[in-house]
């Protein structure tokens, strides 16, 4: 049996779709599961266990000079799909573009969300009813799998690489215990206070001897440099230096992670990283880390969740009020509680 998953973006949503591959293969051991995904997330599709990956380059459309390249990239992928003879095409994106790719796959059966945008449901044979505005992305994906007779069981897939030693050695972390911190998101309102991240790193090193590993894209270098300056000899700045395989390896070996609501949070959740998720303007029921090895901290302000990219109540240039409400002491306490809970759970297993 052959399946095509269509989930091009975004980072967090792609990470939440990773279990779909494993669950299909567990239910149908001889199945071939392919994935159509944006170029920058192809590494995650590979880590998820996809057999064949069809890569589209969405970023090529951003520059007029690259439009011919982008057009032929899309055309090339579209031309290949009908010859794969898929039994099922599963559109987890729910947009016009993904719906068109679903139709072009010529699968025997197309499945997608009933509330898909941009008229995408017209391309589906089966329309799955789930309120995606109020439901976690992972649970939405599980609802789609129910149409294939696949139910979630107690054994949840983990995407930690089998070999992490080479990654640890390449970054000078072999033999070290460390935690991961994510200092930057695309929304200013989601960013935690750099001084607070530095304070948490200092305290965790004093208590446990852990190093702090800062991760993110190249755009995080400035804030990472600030954190490193605030806590000398505590943090290792790996912003812009890891591919997805390396990031998953680091996530699998980290003692824990401290992160706001951002794509890497969901990738770490897929790797099974214990984490403290600091949630600001978004609803943790929908956007928080999925799984039972995390704790969520969120302010009790009545304005939440506001979904504003900039805090409309705070001062310009300063962290959003809801994120500033979360103190380093609260995070360190949450780390200790989570580790104790996981230790107790392991001892009782």
State where each predicted segment sits.
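Catalytic machinery of carbohydrate-active enzymes
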Residues: 1-349
């Amino acid at each position: 049996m052959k399946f095509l998953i269509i989930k091009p973006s975004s980072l967090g949503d792609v990470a939440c779709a990773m279990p779909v591959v494993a669950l299909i293969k567990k239910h149908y051991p001889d199945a071939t599961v392919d994935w159509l995904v944006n170029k920058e997330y192809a590494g995650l599709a590979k880590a998820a266990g996809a057999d064949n990956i069809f890569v589209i380059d969405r970023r090529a459309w951003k520059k007029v000079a690259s439009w011919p390249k982008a057009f032929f990239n899309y055309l090339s992928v579209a031309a290949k799909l009908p010859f794969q003879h898929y039994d099922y095409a599963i559109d987890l994106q729910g947009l016009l573009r993904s719906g068109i790719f679903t139709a072009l796959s010529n699968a025997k059966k197309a499945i997608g969300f009933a509330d898909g945008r941009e008229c995408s449901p017209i391309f589906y044979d089966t329309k799955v009813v789930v309120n995606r505005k109020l439901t976690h992305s992972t649970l939405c994906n599980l609802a789609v799998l129910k149409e294939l007779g696949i139910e979630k069981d107690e054994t949840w897939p983990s995407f930690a690489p089998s070999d992490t030693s080479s990654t640890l050695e390449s970054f000078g972390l072999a033999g070290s215990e460390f935690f991961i911190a994510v200092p930057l998101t695309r929304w200013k309102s989601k960013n935690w206070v750099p001084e607070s991240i530095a304070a948490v790193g200092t305290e965790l090193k004093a208590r446990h001897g852990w190093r702090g590993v800062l991760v993110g894209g190249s755009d995080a270098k400035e804030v990472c440099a600030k954190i490193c300056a605030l806590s000398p000899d505590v943090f290792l700045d790996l912003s812009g230096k890891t591919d997805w395989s390396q990031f998953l390896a680091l996530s699998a070996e980290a003692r824990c992670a401290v992160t706001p609501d951002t794509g890497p949070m969901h990738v770490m959740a897929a790797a099974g990283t214990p984490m403290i998720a600091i949630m600001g303007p978004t609803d943790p029921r929908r956007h928080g880390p999925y799984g039972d090895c995390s704790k969520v901290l969120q302010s009790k302000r009545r304005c939440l969740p506001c979904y504003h990219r900039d805090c409309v109540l705070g001062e310009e240039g300063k962290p959003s009020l809801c994120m500033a409400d979360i103190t380093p002491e609260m995070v360190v306490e949450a780390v200790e509680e989570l580790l104790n809970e996981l230790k107790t759970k392991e001892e009782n297993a």
